[in-house]
Amino acid sequence: MRKLALSIAFVLTGLVMNAQVAKIITKVNEAGDVGSFELDCNKGFPTLGKGLKYNITRHEFKGVELKNTYHVMLVMDRFFTKVLNNTMTISAVFSDGTKVSKIETIEDDGYFDGACTLTLASPPELALNLDLKQIIVNTGEKDVVYTVSAQKSNEFKKNLKNIVDAK
């Protein structure tokens, strides 16, 4: 019985340590009118799946009308591809089938370097209320699909909620 209790304690500790809810870094520009809130990725980026990392940033513009912009930077490890066209489409697919897409311009040499930034609505209600299911990269020749697990989707929502609530 004692061994079982210790085993469960180690498993739970491992799960808690593997949860990728990141700290928030706050910055303000010199003029003091733009604040930025982003995940602290100094020790490593949180992941959505094998080879797919992300960072979330919110820019808060002060003035007559307070305005926020939300960006999700996706980094695809070892995703260097030569494409025939000069653009690629990167899409985030949510549980209700809604897509948020970005057309990425390919570098002059014809290679995609594996990084893309998606812009979310302000406030990002869609991403907070629905589960993120897939990231799809359309290279022009084929779709590369990254499936996001329920655990990673929940971690993403927690990180996004922390960015939204950051002061």
Please give the residue ranges for each predicted region:
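Bacterial Sec-dependent N-terminal signal peptides
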Residues: 1-24
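Internal interaction segment
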Residues: 96-167
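Solvent-exposed loop and beta-edge segments used for protein-protein assembly and interaction
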Residues: 64-68, 84, 112, 129
